[in-house]
């Protein structure tokens, strides 16, 4: 039956994909528990700065931030890739794509599906996954595509079965920033300014109203 191995598989998967879609307000990020815990500790005026750190199992694998391959994506994100009918509505409304940038939300989903297929064939051949030296990041989805996204959610709004390419883009960006400290220079400057001046602009808070005196 052609249905099960063609793009028309989405006819079967559209319902569960819609059922498991994210009901949170669009654009709301998922907070990382470990990071939230550290920030609360830093901002707690009653916290003891000299308190001993909690014991950590030396054999425990450190938590990975974000996603660099399909193994880091959740089941709904993987289901999204197979629910896509490649209609292109998402790319048609993407402001980054319209202005000539490299990003195509449709391609993000196709690349994710291609990587899943690649990993599946690897597992079928070897009985388990054997490192093939490839990742979803860089080998399929380029960094230029990720940083072209404005996170406007137009692609999510346009999809008839509520596929969310933005969630994959955000997770891969999170990996780049938090695991590799890799971000466009403009973003690094902005984050440094927020850290130093509590604002994205490169001047002191005391100088904010100087423009009004001129």
Spell out what each predicted region is.
Residues 72-81, 107, 116-214:
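Iron-sulfur-cluster electron-transfer modules
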Residues 1-54, 67:
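Membrane-embedded alpha-helical bundles of multi-pass integral membrane proteins
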Residues 6-14, 106, 166, 170:
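Short helix-terminus and kink motifs of transmembrane alpha helices
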Residues 5-13, 87-88, 149, 153:
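P-loop NTPase catalytic cores that bind/hydrolyze ATP
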Residues 46-119, 123-124:
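Membrane-proximal soluble helical/coiled-coil segments
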Residues 4, 20, 24, 95, ...:
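Hydrophobic/aromatic-lined pockets within catalytic cores
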Residues 15-20, 34-35, 108-112, 173, ...:
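A glycine-rich phosphate-binding loop feature that marks nucleotide/adenosyl-phosphate handling sites
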